Amino acid sequence: MLRERATAPASTPRSRVAISFGSPAGESGVTRLDLNEILIRNPQAAFLVRIAGSAMREAGIDDGDLALVDRALDANHGQVVIAVHQNEFLCRRLCRRDEALGLQATDSDVPDIWASEADNVDVWGVVTHVIKQVSG
């Protein structure tokens, strides 16, 4: 019989779980999770962005997701970044070819952006984690 717990647990296990939580009676080794500690490497340079649109759906980033962005990290080829192009924030995969800078969506209906010297593209930071709402 599956029972819903009326209140949140006092603390959350901090271990890897493959398929089950084990016995609810055995709470040894339980500590509180600090998502700041787990997810954020550079607290002064981290911020959250709410994703709008489906341009990065094939990368698992959907409309309404929260993206954790780290501005202290160097953006490398192939990483998902938040960038500003023509005064618009974009979530795209960064591409570098020779001296050219590209922003690619995973949705084939969204055109790639290749920055020339005339374009104003500013990479704000690297997306390190994506937070999804799965219920509610």
Walk through the language-model features, giving the residues of each.
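Short, well-ordered loop/turn sites that connect or cap secondary structure elements
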Residues: 61-62, 75
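Short coil-to-beta-strand transition motifs
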Residues: 63, 85-90, 121-122
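C-terminal structural segments of small proteins and small subunits
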Residues: 110-130
